Amino acid sequence: ASPVVCEDGGIRLGAWIRDSMAGVGTLTYYDPATGSYGALGHGITDVDTAELMPLASGSIMETMVKAVKKGQRGDPGELKGDFTVQRDVGTVTVNSNEGIFGTVEDAGFISGEAVSVAEPEEVHAGEASILCTISGSDTRAYEVEILRVNPRSRDGRDLLLRVTDPELLETTGGIVQGMSGSPILQDGRLVGAVTHVLVANPAEG
C-alpha cells in the first residue's frame, strides 16, 4: 500500500489487517511415532483475497459437531461445531496448499487402528470409504466411490469421488465444508483426503 496526501495536507495510509482465523476441519492422519499430523488437505486462505495465509502460530482444538447445513446444488453445505476451548490439543506449524501440519500434544482424543499409506499406483477407481464426523464427536466410515484417478494433477486434486452412503447423503447431501481433510481409505490403506466439493454436485468432490 502507498500513502496518500489528503485534502488537508495530511498523509494517510489504509491497511487491511487480519490477525487470526478459526474454522472447522478434519484431521487426516496422526503419526504416534513422531506426534506429527496433517489436516484439511488444502491450505487456509484469506476469505477476501483467496491467498494462502501467512502463519506465525496456530493451534488445534477438539470440536463437537452441533448441526449440519445440508449441501444442495449451487449451495455448499457446512458442519457447524463448538470448539473445546479449555485446552489446545496441538500446534500448527505449517500452512501449505496441501494442508496444515504440526504436532499433536495431547492425543487423548485420537482413537482407531493404524493403517498403511498406499503408493500412488495402488489407488484405483472403485469402492472406498471416508472417515468423518457429522454429529458430536462420533467418527464413522461412510461409503464412497472413486470415479477417476489422476495422479499427475497439477492442482493437487488427484482423484474424483462420489458419496454413495445413504446416511451421509441424507444428512449432509454429500461433501460439506468442515469435511476437508477427511481420510479416504481403500483396500485398508490411506489413499488421500477430501479437499473440495463440486458446487454443482455436492455428492462429488
Positions of PLM-derived features:
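C-terminal recognition in membrane/secretory proteostasis and scaffolding
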Residues: A1-G205
